[in-house]
Amino acid sequence: HMVWGLHPTLPVKKLWFFPGFTDRTGGLLIEDGLDEARRAFDAAAWRRAHGARDGLRTLFFFAYPVNAIDRLAAGLRAAGEPLNLMLAPGEASDMLERALKGDARFNVVRLPFVPQEEFDDILRAVDGAVIRGEDSFVRAQLAGTPLLWATYPTEDKAHEIKLDAWLARFRDCLLYTSPS
């Protein structure tokens, strides 16, 4: 973070800026009024307006096609719980929908791509989310939504480094906030 480097193809310098959770990063950009917006949001009304069935838990799914989608589908089936599945556009959602096809316990709702403000509404409306990417990862936490972070595997294992760093930070937070 805050390191100057050369652009790979142009004769210009770049300043690397990385968001994050420590003093060695650029921190997180959190807009004013976020807590008030979260408290004022009517999640049940949003779910009804977007095709969710009342009385079911709702999971938002936004992953990469390289993630373990068949294993997720098998786990959802094995859990035996009826569920609203709000699927973001993309191949990964197509794969999950095919894997769960014919199982009436799952109310599958296909959502369109939306602007950031509406994406935050999705995250506020659901009981949990499978999300991809660093931005979605942060926005889900800011929405207070339990999440499974579906990282994109890279050859240099950067995804594992990011995940391990977050898990270490999360464990520290749990220890700090633990009632015991």
Regions picked out by a protein language model, each given a short descriptive name:
Residues H1, N84-P89, A129-I131:
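Short, hydrophobic beta-strand segments that form beta-sheet elements in well-ordered domains
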Residues H1-I69:
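A nucleotide-sugar donor-handling region in carbohydrate enzymes
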Residues M2-P8, L76, L96-G102, K162:
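Short, aromatic/basic amphipathic alpha-helical patches
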Residues R71-E81:
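Short hydrophobic signal-anchor/transmembrane segments that target glycosyltransferases
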Residues G80-P112:
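Catalytic donor nucleotide-activated moiety binding site of glycosyltransferases and closely related
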Residues F113-K162:
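A donor-sugar binding/catalytic signature common to diverse glycosyltransferases
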Residues K162-R171:
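Post-HExxH zinc-binding segment in Zn-dependent metallohydrolases
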Residues Y176-S180:
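Conserved small/polar residues in nucleotide/adenosyl-binding loops
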